[in-house]
Amino acid sequence: MKSFPPVVFIILACITVSCRKDSFITGKNAIVNFSSDTLFFDTVFTSTGSITQSVKIINGNNQKLLLTDVRLMGGSASRFVLNIDGTPGPEQDNVTLEAGDSLYVFVTVQINPGSANLPFIVQDSIQVAYNGNQEYIQLQAWGQNAHFLRNTIINSNTTWDNTLPYVILGGLQVDTTATLTIPAGCKVYFHADAPLLVDGTLQVTGNKYDSTKVWFQGDRLDEPYSDYPGSWPGIYFRSTSVNNSLQFAVIKNAYQAIVAEMPSVNASPKVVLTQCIVDNAYDAGILGEQSSIQASNCLISNCGQNIELGYGGVYQFTHCTVASFSNNFIAHTQPVLSVSNYIIQGTTAVTADLNAGFINCIFWGNYGNVTDEVVVSQQGSTAFAVNFSNCLWKVQTVPTGISSTAMIANVDPLFDSVNTAQSYYDFHLQAGSPAIDKGINTGLPYDLDGNPRSVGAAPDLGCYEKQ
């Protein structure tokens, strides 16, 4: 019997494998995998459109596979839009997938305005047909009607309603003679190019519950963008702005959350913040420049620089928690509080009078490279008064030129929960916190939650009273 050398068998095996890869698998037991069985779009505002999401269709076989049909079940009438392997349209027929290969289907959604006030659901599916099988990828989006304001100037007294959110595109300006009043429960979403510029007056009248607070944030609500700092510019109280008041407001994910420029034009503070949360601002949470700000029972957290007060001004912070932790978005490299009486113009320090007071506050940071969380700088001979009373702070070098009374230094305030990996922060106080009962009576009856301060022998430090 004639024998063949081993190399012949190797060649024959290679030919067999090659032929197999060039042939199509036709059985119903062919393997098709999806990178996801559902694409979920978080809140999509009507008329604005969504981000693009994608799903991968994978041929898990060692032979070619013919996808006889990849189609959007709602067809051209669907609110979803497909791009199948680079070709736009609701359907593609007879798509060949090589052995082990895959293709991408890109999906967006555009939702028409309707009459619903509450969020509503929009659904469809993608059918993938092959070898007599039909499998489906589910598509789901939350739609939300809204008031849309593009490059808008408010030039007369205006009160918004809270039935629908407001989406700001291109910017919103409150003119010098106008007052904008935003009521409890209103939600305001800003596009990346949309600051709120206040030349007149802004009145925010929120309430203590999450559903009745007033929310200011970016308009990207899908993951992971919903928590990105710097997703919108922020709120700017400019030189002519007067009598601004924000109560139970949440300002999050801005570049500079609150900026107050120049002195008040009357005896009242330019900006009064009561029971507000300023969170996750990329550059600064509160930035004051020769201005006047009064803040009580406020939380300023996890910003590039939480509070920066420069070039003098008049500032009063009472029962505020000012805390920052390095996290997935912002490295903690700056003190949580910086106060100075000057700015540098060219090579010259220009000074202005400074009067700043901090009572019953917590200044803390961690997981960064900051050793002094409070920094105070003075130049020149202009009036300079910076006073701290009954505060807990993290400082290795106590600032010079200040007065301080009953301070607690470098003792962990024992916040309830800080989990940077999960981006979860609860700045309530644990039992046994050194901040409990260490404050003085300031006449403020309630904390940030709206709970009474009259618990224990004395008020607690920070924005939350341990109940």
Regions found by a protein language model. Name each.
Residues 15-18:
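C-terminal motif of bacterial Sec signal peptides marking the signal peptidase cleavage site
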Residues 20-25, 32-43, 48-50, 54, ...:
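Beta-strand/loop edge motif enriched in small/polar residues
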Residues 50-51, 62-67:
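Short acidic/proline- and small/hydrophobic-mixed sequence motifs that coincide with surface turns
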Residues 73-91:
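Short, solvent-exposed loop/linker segments at beta-strand-coil boundaries, enriched for Pro/Gly
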